[in-house]
């Protein structure tokens, strides 16, 4: 799920730090996204999110076969309202939102890589300074399939 948050740098929170569960789970179980780690990860890109305006969860949706390999199917989403985007000094943000939906197929054999990932992210905001209005609305959708080498 690196496409959701970003590529990991030394010392940064990993996707497992943000989306995984510390407990064993069964199909149908849901758990919250690690809000603290997610918000810190966005902060690296100068996106400021208040904890009370961020929510997200991940679900173990099932066990599926992908290319004959048994995988856990994880799905999830997160949402941030009224965040502070990186806008020029003096601009006042009137409205902002960030939503993401994601899914992935993770082999039960942890030596194998994630085989499928789907990510759909939308970020928008509107800000102004005197007569100048700044609007941003971007949607990124990715479908990634991995074929392990023998």
List where the protein language model places each region:
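PEST-like low-complexity, intrinsically disordered acidic/proline/serine-rich tracts
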Residues: 1-26
């Amino acid at each position: 799920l690196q496409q959701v948050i970003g590529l990991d740098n030394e010392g940064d929170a990993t996707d497992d730090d943000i989306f995984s569960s510390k407990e064993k789970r069964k199909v149908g179980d849901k758990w919250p996204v690690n809000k603290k780690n997610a918000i810190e990860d966005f902060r690296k890109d100068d996106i400021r999110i208040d904890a009370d305006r961020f929510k997200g969860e991940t679900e173990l949706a099932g066990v599926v076969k992908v290319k004959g390999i048994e995988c856990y199917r994880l799905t999830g989403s997160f949402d941030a309202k009224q965040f502070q985007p990186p806008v020029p000094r003096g601009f006042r943000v009137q409205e902002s939102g960030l939503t993401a939906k994601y899914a992935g197929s993770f082999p039960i054999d942890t030596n194998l890589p994630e085989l499928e990932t789907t990510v759909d992210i939308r970020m928008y905001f509107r800000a102004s300074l005197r007569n100048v209005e700044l609007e941003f609305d971007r949607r990124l959708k990715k479908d990634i399939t991995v074929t392990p080498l023998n």
